[in-house]
Design a protein with these regions (language model features):
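A generic transmembrane alpha-helix motif of multi-pass inner-membrane proteins
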Residues: 1-21, 396-444
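Membrane-interface "cap" regions at the ends of multi-pass membrane proteins
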Residues: 1-59, 167-173, 189, 246, ...
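Helix-loop-helix module between adjacent transmembrane segments
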Residues: 15, 74-167, 225-226, 314-322
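Hydrophobic alpha-helical segments and their helix-loop junctions in multi-pass secondary transporters
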Residues: 17-25, 91, 131-138, 147-158, ...
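Membrane-interface helix-loop-helix modules in multi-pass membrane proteins
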Residues: 34-101, 224, 236, 246-282, ...
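Select transmembrane alpha-helical segments in multipass membrane proteins
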Residues: 41-48, 85-86, 116-129, 158-159, ...
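Hydrophobic, small-residue-rich membrane helices and short re-entrant helix-turn-helix hairpins
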Residues: 102-111, 171-180, 232-265, 281-292, ...
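Loop-to-transmembrane helix boundary motifs in multi-pass membrane proteins
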Residues: 116-120, 329-365
Length: 444
C-alpha cells in the first residue's frame, strides 16, 4: 500500500505542476474549455483516446470479456470502426463549424437550426446522461484503490478531488497535456499486462459468438448507442474543436484508430486469459466481473500491479475531466448563457464534480451496462446531427420533440429494463424528429 500511495502522490504532483503552469495563463472560456483551438494533432489524438478508453476498458471490458466471451471484443471493435467512420465523415465538418462560428459548447451547433430552447434542453439532457457515465470512471478508480486497502468511499473521495482540482485549475489545456502523457503510459502498461497473462495462464477462453449471452438482438441493443458514440457524446464532439489545423485531422484519426485497435485487443485478451485461468483452477470463479482486473492485480508482483493501477487511474481521471469540463461549458453557455464570465464556468466545474461524487457512492450497476445506458440517452442527438449535415427539414419543433421525447423514451426503457431499449430509443428519436419536422412545416 505504501508504494502505491507514493506513486499516486508522485502522479498527482506531476499532473498538478502541469496544470498550475497552464493555470498561469489568462484564460477566456475558449481557452479554458477547448484550449484556445491550438492543440497539435498528436495531442488531440491521445486526448481523444484517453478520453474514450477509460475505466470502462481495463476494468469494465476485461470483466465483460471474462464473463461473456468473444462478443465483448466484437462489441468494442464495432464501436471503434463506427467511430473512425464518423470521424472521417464528420470530423472536418464539425471542426469547420466550430472555427467559423466560434462554438465552444457542442450544443451551440444546434442553436441556429433548432433554436436556443433545443440548445438549452440538449445541455440538460447531456447533464442527466453524463453524470452516471462520469461516475463509471470514479467507481473504477475506487475498485482499484480497494486492492491497496483504501475503502470505497475514501477511493471515491480521492478520485473526485483529483478530477476537480485538475479541471478547475487547468481547464482543457492542462487536461490535454496530461492526457497525452497518460495515453503513452496506458499503452505501455497494457502491453506489459498482456505479456504477464501469456506467461501466467495457458490459452484463452473466448466462448463462441453468438452465445447464450451475446444473442443477435442483445448485441444490436448494446452496440447501437455505442456505435454512434463519436457523434452523440458531447465530450468527444467537443474534442474536434480543439485541433489547430484541419490538415491534422486525418493524422489524428489514424493515430487514434491504431491506439484503439491495439488497446481493445489487448484488454479483451486479458479477460479471455483470466477466464482460462479460472477454468484451469488457477483463479477462483469471479462473480462480480468488475473485480476481475483487481483479482489479477492481486496475483501480479508490485512491479506490474502498481503501474497497472496507475494506468486505470490515468484513464479514469482523463475521461472524468473531459466530461466535467464539457458539462460545465454547456451549463455555462447553453443554459445560463454566460459566455464571457469565467467564474460561473469554474463554479459549475465544482458542482458537476460534486454530483459525480454523490452518484458514484451509489454504485448502481456494472460499469459497461451503466456506460451503455448513458449512451442510450444521448441517442437523442443523432437525428439532430443527421439533420444538420444532410437534411433541410426540421426546426425548433423537431429539435425540442427529439430531445425531450427521446430522453423520456430512453429513461423509460432503462427504468423498465426493456431488453431492446436501445432499438426502441433509436426508432423513437427519429420518429419524433420527423413528427417535429412536420410541425415546423405546418407552422411555417
Amino acid at each position: 500500500m505504501t508504494q502505491f500511495i507514493v506513486l499516486l502522490a508522485l502522479y498527482v504532483i506531476i499532473g498538478s505542476v502541469i496544470v498550475l503552469i497552464v493555470a498561469k495563463r489568462k484564460q477566456t472560456q475558449e481557452e479554458f474549455f477547448i484550449g484556445g483551438r491550438t492543440a497539435h494533432w498528436i495531442v488531440t489524438a491521445l486526448t481523444y483516446a484517453a478520453t474514450t478508453y477509460s475505466a470502462f476498458m481495463m476494468v469494465g471490458l476485461v470483466g465483460m470479456a471474462y464473463g461473456t466471451g468473444l462478443g465483448a471484443m466484437i462489441f468494442e471493435l464495432v464501436y471503434l470502426a463506427a467511430t473512425v467512420l464518423i470521424l472521417v465523415v464528420y470530423g472536418k465538418r464539425i471542426w469547420h463549424l466550430g472555427k467559423t462560428h466560434g462554438y465552444v459548447s457542442p450544443m451551440e451547433m444546434f442553436a441556429d437550426r433548432y433554436g436556443k430552447l433545443t440548445e438549452a434542453l440538449g445541455a440538460i439532457v447531456a447533464f442527466v446522461a453524463l453524470i452516471p457515465y462520469a461516475s463509471v470512471q470514479v467507481i473504477g478508480l475506487a475498485l482499484v484503490f480497494g486492492n491497496y486497502g483504501i475503502g470505497f468511499v475514501a477511493g471515491v473521495t480521492i478520485a473526485s478531488l483529483i478530477i476537480f482540482v485538475w479541471a478547475f485549475l487547468g481547464g482543457l489545456r492542462g487536461v490535454a497535456l496530461t492526457d497525452a502523457l497518460q495515453g503513452f503510459f496506458m499503452m505501455a502498461v497494457a502491453i506489459a499486462v498482456l505479456t504477464w497473462t501469456g506467461q501466467e495462464f495457458q490459452g484463452l477462453e473466448m466462448s463462441t459468438f453468438p452465445n447464450q449471452v451475446w444473442t443477435p438482438l442483445f448485441f444490436i441493443n448494446i452496440t447501437l448507442p455505442w456505435a454512434f458514440f463519436a457523434l452523440t457524446n458531447p465530450q468527444v464532439v467537443q474534442r474536434l474543436f480543439i485541433i489547430k489545423d484541419p490538415a491534422g485531422i486525418k493524422k489524428m484519426i489514424i493515430l487514434f484508430a491504431s491506439f484503439g485497435l491495439v488497446y481493445t485487443v489487448i484488454v479483451s485478451v486479458v479477460g479471455f486469459a483470466a477466464k482460462a485461468g479460472t477454468l484451469e483452477g488457477i483463479l477462483p470463479m469471479i462473480e462480480d466481473r468488475d473485480t476481475v482486473i483487481v483479482q489479477l492485480m492481486g496475483r501480479m508482483g508490485a512491479v506490474l500491479a502498481l503501474p497497472l493501477g496507475l494506468s486505470i487511474i490515468f484513464a479514469s481521471v482523463s475521461t472524468s475531466n473531459s466530461i466535467i469540463l464539457t458539462l460545465a461549458s454547456m451549463m455555462t453557455r447553453d443554459v445560463f448563457r454566460m459566455r464571457k464570465n469565467m467564474i460561473i464556468g469554474r463554479v459549475f466545474t465544482f458542482v458537476m464534480t460534486l454530483l459525480v461524487f454523490l452518484f458514484s457512492l451509489l454504485r448502481p450497476d456494472y460499469l459497461v451496462e451503466l456506460s451503455v445506458s448513458s449512451s442510450r440517452i444521448l441517442l437523442v442527438f443523432l437525428p439532430l446531427y443527421i439533420g444538420l449535415f444532410h437534411w433541410k427539414l426540421g426546426g425548433v419543433c423537431a429539435g425540442v420533440f427529439t430531445v425531450v421525447g427521446g430522453a423520456i423514451i430512453a429513461v423509460l426503457v432503462n427504468v423498465l429494463g426493456a431488453s431492446l431499449g436501445s432499438i426502441y430509443t433509436f426508432i423513437g428519436v427519429f420518429v419524433l424528429f420527423f413528427i417535429g419536422a412536420l410541425c415546423d412545416r405546418a407552422l411555417d
